[in-house]
């Protein structure tokens, strides 16, 4: 169905060309000039072609996304994903993909916002679990309220997390900005802005249930 189709920046390009395009786009992201260590590091990376992001971001290497039993992961996504996320879309994005994403605004078509408000009222935060393994990947909001988290996510089209909202035990960032789980789940990308690292994440990648329940 159209609503579950993937978004590609330039669908007519070959995979190799697309990879180059995405890498180039992320390397050339504009960052406001400010006298802080974050912007100094990002600016230096852009000038000298280095691929690293400042702490607390934890870097990983390509071996994380090496072929496994099910694409880049050992298992398919869970059957009963949260927020009525589509299984087929989730499995393709999580396990057989490095560049595609759910379409912008997809997360608002699910039951996420309604259920997130309830969870936030009860617990003061929302847990986001790996759609494959059920391991915790993000906890939000932190350092802001739910409305601020939703507003930022709405403005970018995808759930958007900050450094303090990442469970770094289970998440890594690759040199091209790709955000992945330590088990090989494609999550999205790190797209730094003037506030710091911003992790633009597919909802279908973090719609798992704890421990695969």
Each model region followed by its residue ranges:
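Generic hydrophobic secondary-structure signal
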Residues: 1, 26, 30-32, 187, ...
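N-terminal chloroplast transit peptides
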Residues: 1-30
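Flexible coil/turn and secondary-structure edge motifs
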Residues: 41-213
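Intrinsically disordered, low-complexity coil segments
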Residues: 17-19, 37, 116-120
């Amino acid at each position: 169905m159209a609503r579950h189709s993937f978004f590609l920046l330039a669908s007519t390009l070959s995979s190799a060309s697309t990879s180059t395009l995405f890498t180039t786009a992320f390397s050339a992201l504009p960052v406001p000039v400010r006298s802080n260590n974050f912007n100094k590091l990002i600016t230096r990376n852009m000038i000298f072609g280095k691929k690293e992001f400042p702490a607390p971001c934890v870097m990983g290497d390509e071996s994380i996304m090496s072929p496994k039993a099910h694409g880049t992961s050992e298992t398919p996504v869970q059957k009963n994903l949260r927020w009525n996320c589509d299984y087929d879309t989730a499995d393709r994005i999580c396990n057989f993909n490095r560049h595609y994403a759910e379409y912008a605004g997809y997360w608002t078509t699910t039951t996420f916002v309604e259920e997130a408000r309830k969870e936030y009222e009860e617990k003061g935060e929302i847990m986001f679990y790996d759609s494959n393994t059920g391991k915790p990947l993000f906890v939000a909001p932190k350092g802001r309220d739910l409305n601020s988290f939703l507003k930022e996510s709405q403005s970018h089209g995808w759930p958007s997390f900050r450094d303090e909202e990442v469970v770094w035990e289970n998440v890594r960032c690759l040199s091209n900005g790709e955000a992945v789980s330590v088990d090989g789940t494609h999550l999205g990308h790190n797209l730094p802005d003037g506030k710091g690292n911003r992790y633009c994440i597919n909802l279908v990648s973090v719609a798992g249930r704890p421990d695969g329940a």
